[in-house]
């Protein structure tokens, strides 16, 4: 069942069209200068695609959107440091966000288990 779910998400990621042609060196330079409109173009170009990527890791669409939004917030706060091309950076940032989310789930489960044992 898990294999089928992964295969479906992989297909969805391929089918989702993102307009990467809009994201060029000039756009990244404008973001680095703090231009909000340029950042909005980047966000709108990648949001759906990155949500699908994140969801393929964690299988939770709400959390996937949160991870993508947190990633974009970090990008905005670190503007001035972005370089072109940005696609690989975005994918890696989403992967790291998903791994951090999964680690936090594991930690929470472990704490709950320890608490239950202490109560017994």
Where do the PLM segments sit?
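N-terminal module of bacterial RNA polymerase sigma factors
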Residues: 1-48
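Sigma70-family region 2
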Residues: 32-33, 70-86, 105-106
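Arg/Lys-rich amphipathic alpha helix in sigma70-family domain 2
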Residues: 81, 95-113
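Alpha-helical structural segments
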Residues: 41-45, 70, 118
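Hydrophobic-face residues of short alpha-helical interaction/recognition segments
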Residues: 50, 54, 90, 94-102
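Hydrophobic/aromatic residues within well-ordered alpha-helical segments
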Residues: 42-46, 50, 86, 94
């Amino acid at each position: 069942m898990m294999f089928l779910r992964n295969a479906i998400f992989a297909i969805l990621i391929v089918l989702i069209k993102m307009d990467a042609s809009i994201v060029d060196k000039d756009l990244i330079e404008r973001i680095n200068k703090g231009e909000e409109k340029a950042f909005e173009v980047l966000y709108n170009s990648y949001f759906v695609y990155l949500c699908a990527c994140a969801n393929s890791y964690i299988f939770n669409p709400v959390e996937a959107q949160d991870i993508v939004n947190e990633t974009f917030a970090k990008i905005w706060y670190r503007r001035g440091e972005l370089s072109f091309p940005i696609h690989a950076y975005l994918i890696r940032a989403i992967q790291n966000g998903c791994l951090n989310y999964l680690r936090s789930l594991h930690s929470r489960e472990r704490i709950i288990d320890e608490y239950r044992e202490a109560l017994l």
